[in-house]
From Swiss-Prot:
Protein name, per record: Nuclear distribution protein nudE homolog 1-A
GO cellular component: centrosome; cleavage furrow; cytoplasmic vesicle membrane; kinesin complex; kinetochore; microtubule; spindle pole centrosome
Species of provenance: Xenopus laevis
Record has Membrane as a keyword: yes
GO annotation terms (biological process): cell division; cell migration; centrosome duplication; centrosome localization; chromosome segregation; establishment of chromosome localization; establishment of mitotic spindle orientation; microtubule nucleation
Stretches of the chain forming a coiled coil according to its record: 22-189
One MF term in the entry's GO annotations: microtubule binding
Classification of source organism: Eukaryota, Metazoa, Chordata, Craniata, Vertebrata
Post-translational modification summary for this protein: Phosphorylated in mitosis.
Gene3D superfamilies assigned: 6.10.250.1080
Family, as annotated: Belongs to the nudE family.
Length: 349
């Protein structure tokens, strides 16, 4: 405006034209501003509509998000409750499992200790088993030896019983033949008074051999007659001939006394064996009675001593008694000891 007031016009028309041009200019500016205002209003209405639509959309979305937030919050609360519950349950379960684990470790330690003890006991049992097996084998070996020894001793006892039976039979025959002897003495008194001095000397030697049975008589004068009695058959034949009534020769008598001495020595050895067997069996089975064996041995020895004491009588009876004691049995007596290791006594039995 100051610029306009400072203008100097030359005429009124120039001033009017000037002011007209200025009015036109401002009018054009006003129209442009009005147009811009309308455009701005239209754009503002469009923006407002868009903003309202966006606001509505945002509000709807906000409501959805709020509801979703509420739902998620509720889910979170439920999950928290479930987590707390699960955590408490897990804590209890973990505590229980820890207790079970400690108990299991204690049981495992006890079982390991028990296994070590069982292994040690197993080793001890194996050593004891080996020792027992060795002792059992030793015991079986000793038992087999004892069984063999008992069987051998039982065989000897059976042989001894057979010997006792034969001795009893000989005693019976001796009793019968004594009666016959009494009859023959009445019939043969002249013959009994004609005994030669040589026969008396031989009877004296027979009595000496009876007194010491452990030392058999083997003088030079008897070697020839002893050679004739080496075989059981010849000795048996000579003894059978003794029953025919002819007296025994001095050689036969001395051989018979030697056999009696051998018999006594063998009986003594058998008694020592039976005594050792009795001690062994007493150690194995203390309750087994052995008095019968010792009694029978005693009776056998007494019987043999009685026969020897009878044999030391008169010179006439000695030959007949030797024939009775070492003579042949009847034909029905079995020859069961011909090959026995007991010698001539078994051959007689």
């Amino acid at each position: 405006m100051d610029d306009l007031e400072n203008n100097i016009f030359n005429s009124v028309e120039e001033e009017i034209l000037y002011w007209k041009s200025v009015a036109m200019k401002y009018k054009q500016c006003s129209e442009e501003a009005q147009q811009e205002l309308q455009e701005f209003q239209e754009a503002s209405r469009e923006y407002e509509a868009e903003l309202e639509a966006q606001l509505l959309q945002t509000e709807g979305r906000n409501r959805d998000l709020f509801s979703e937030n509420n739902r998620l919050r509720m889910e979170l609360d439920a999950i928290k409750e479930k987590y707390e519950e699960q955590h408490s349950e897990n804590y209890v379960q973990i505590s229980t499992l820890e207790g079970d684990l400690s108990q299991t470790k204690a049981v495992r330690d006890q079982l390991q200790k028990y296994i070590r003890e069982l292994e040690q006991a197993n080793d001890d049992l194996e050593r004891a088993k080996r020792a027992t097996i060795m002792s059992l084998e030793d015991f079986e070996q000793r038992l087999n030896q004892a069984i063999e020894r008992n069987a051998f001793l039982e065989n000897e006892l059976d042989e001894k019983e057979n010997l006792l039976e034969s001795v009893q039979r000989l005693k019976d025959e001796a009793r019968d033949l004594r009666q016959e002897l009494a009859v023959q003495q009445k019939q043969e008194k002249p013959k009994s008074n004609m005994v030669s001095p040589e026969t008396e000397r031989m009877d004296t030697s027979v009595q000496a051999s009876i007194a010491i049975p452990s030392a058999p008589l083997t003088p030079l004068s008897q070697r020839g007659c002893a050679s004739t009695l080496t075989s059981p058959l010849s000795f048996r034949t000579s003894l059978d001939d003794g029953y025919s009534g002819t007296p025994l020769t001095p050689c036969a008598r001395i051989s018979a006394l030697n056999i009696v001495g051998d018999l006594l020595r063998k009986v003594g050895a058998l008694e020592s064996k039976l005594a050792s067997c009795r001690n062994f069996v007493h150690e194995q089975s203390p309750n087994r009675p052995l008095t019968s064996v010792s009694a029978r041995m005693k009776k056998t020895r007494e019987g043999i001593e009685n026969r020897l004491s009878i044999a030391s009588g008169s010179s006439v009876e000695k030959g007949l008694i030797k024939r009775l004691e070492f003579g042949s049995f009847p034909s029905n007596t079995p020859m069961q000891g011909m090959h026995s290791p007991q010698g001539v006594v078994k051959m007689i039995i």
